[in-house]
Amino acid sequence: MQPQPHISPNTATAAISAALESQRSRKNRGSYNCGRCGQPKKGHVCLLTAPPDIPTTPIASEPVSCISAAASSSRSTVLSLTAAPSSRQTFTHLRRALSFDDVDARNSLDESDLDAASMDLDLQLDTDIVQPGRFHAVGLWEVLKRLPPSSLLMAARVCKGWRETSRKMWKAAEELRIRVPERAQIGYIGSLLQKCPRLIRLSLKIESDFDATTLACIAFSCPNLEVLEITTSGAAVNRISGDELSRFVANKRGLTSLKMEGCSNLGGFSLSSSSLSTLWLSDLHSLSKMIFNCPNLTEISLEFSRQEDDSTDLVTMVDGLGRTCTRLQNIHIASLKLSHTVVLSLTAVNFRYLRMLSLVLGINITDASVAAISSGYKNLELLDLSGSSITDTGLGMICDVLPDTLSKLLVALCPNITSSGIQFATAQLPLLELMDCGMTVSDPNSDNPTFVENPSPHKTPGYNQKMFIKHKRLKKLSLWGCSSLDALFLNCPELMDLNLNLCSNLHPESLVLQCPKLQLVYASGCQGLLTGAIRKQVSENFSAGENHMPRKRLADASKRIQALPSLYQETREDGIYAGKRRKLEKEMCTIIH
């Protein structure tokens, strides 16, 4: 597939505005020239047929969809409309509740697939009526599909051809992402949704208060909806109750994914759906009941408010999940009420397919809880116990049970873990690719670690800790807030992302980075000289990885081969080519400070 040129929404909007002004100043009488050969229409009979690559009745592959930021191309234009894959290529890149990898899905649809699928939907676009600008319908479609909805509405006012094209584009849309401004009325959402009868995926970012009227509008306008995501911004309040949410889920029998923020007013709910597979609810507080009758649910993420007066019974909730949602693979629970009792209830249920477990902010989760998890779930790929009270002993239990499966371990905000435990975990987990140890090796007397320009050489011995990590597969390492760390040695050939934010006691002369693939380093709040030391070592790693052996062409000048220094004297021409090649192959590392 040839890369499509990026057309900025601002540029396209400006062009549309200019076209509108020209339309007001003169009357559009249509085109006087033939749309195929360019000759005057008067007395003209065109003998040319439409070229095969620009059909007279173009285009749109299967329904046009709005690609989300996680699955878009290098353009990150919000709410842009792009062509959807054909039915032979289905892309379901739903971000997992417990996935900490950046999703970089690309649309791999090539032009042949696009042409083959273009006949499935007859848009009846006539190239002769596309005015002004005299675009072919194919070119107009390529321009309009890059516009956000607001600009697409403006484009419909240019002329009849543009209005018909934009109308058919709305009609074919499968996915839509909308930012609802603070002053917008409920009719704003309804007017947009009524234009998209084929809509399957909907994402709303709401900046004002909303209630069940929004759900009713969505249910009425989107009969085929499968994925719904509602996020809040600013001071927006979600006033949807638990009964209203339960009614919506029960009526939308095709709904497979529901993600909603600001669920502080639910009070309690009973969700019943045979199709729902992904459920994210955040800002939950004091729920009187939580009933899940969703046999196909595979992923659940429940985040509770960080208030001490939360009265939600997590033990009863976990028991209910075990009875009705036996297919769960990913579980994420963030609550201050997490305790060892909840963990025991979770292990007693024994989810057979569980692969990712995240229990965050559970200060009452101890090494005994780790022992229960290790005995009940021996195939975990991700384990997140951030904010717990586990120690190095708990890390040892994890390493003993999960060395063959665990690839992601997150133990941030665990003050009882030391650098020795972290080193032991990296040595005993050969498949580890991501590790988050933020705020573990930190100074307990400093709640707010700050930058220290001239640290004192005389520190309390217990607070100065050193860390030596050697790992063949580790790709991401986070040591943010480890203010007691004064020496760091990393030998990780696959490491690409390193977070050293607020490592204020880390000395430049005590930092060794043997990471040739390092691409991104965070060093905010560190010593001033540390950034220079990082940049120097990364540069040296790249230089060490380059091949400085001279090369020589064969007798027929067809191929370059390595030659021994004693047998070959490098010429100026070879040096120029080698320098260009090294310049192209060299990768840059970004340091954020």
UniProtKB/Swiss-Prot annotation:
The keyword Cell cycle applies. GO terms for biological process: DNA damage response; embryo development ending in seed dormancy; generative cell mitosis; pollen development; protein ubiquitination; regulation of cell division; SCF-dependent proteasomal ubiquitin-dependent protein catabolic process; seed development. LRR repeats lie at residues 178-206, 207-232, 237-262, 276-304, 335-361, 362-387, 414-439, 477-502, 503-525. Disruption phenotype: Stabilization of KRP6 and inhibition of germ cell cycle progression leading to male sterility. It is found in: Nucleus. InterPro entries: F-box-like_dom_sf, F-box_dom, F-box_LRR-repeat, Leu-rich_rpt_Cys-con_subtyp, LRR_dom_sf. GO terms for cellular component: male germ cell nucleus; nucleus; SCF ubiquitin ligase complex; site of double-strand break. Pathway: Protein modification; protein ubiquitination. Residues 120-177 form the F-box domain. Expressed in developing pollen. Keywords: Cell cycle, Developmental protein, Leucine-rich repeat, Nucleus, Repeat, Ubl conjugation pathway. Part of a SCF (ASK-cullin-F-box) protein ligase complex. Interacts with SKP1A/ASK1, KRP4, KRP6 and KRP7. The F-box is necessary for the interaction with ASK proteins. Essential protein for male fertility. Component of the SCF(ASK-cullin-F-box) E3 ubiquitin ligase complex SCF(FBL17), which mediates the ubiquitination and subsequent proteasomal degradation of target proteins. Enables the switch in cell cycle control leading to male germ cell lineage formation from microspores after meiosis. Targets CDKA-1 inhibitors the degradation specifically in male germ cells (e.g. KRP6 and KRP7) and thus enables CDKA-1 activation and germ cell S-phase progression. Promotes twin sperm cell production and double fertilization. This is F-box/LRR-repeat protein 17. It comes from Arabidopsis thaliana (Mouse-ear cress). The gene is FBL17.
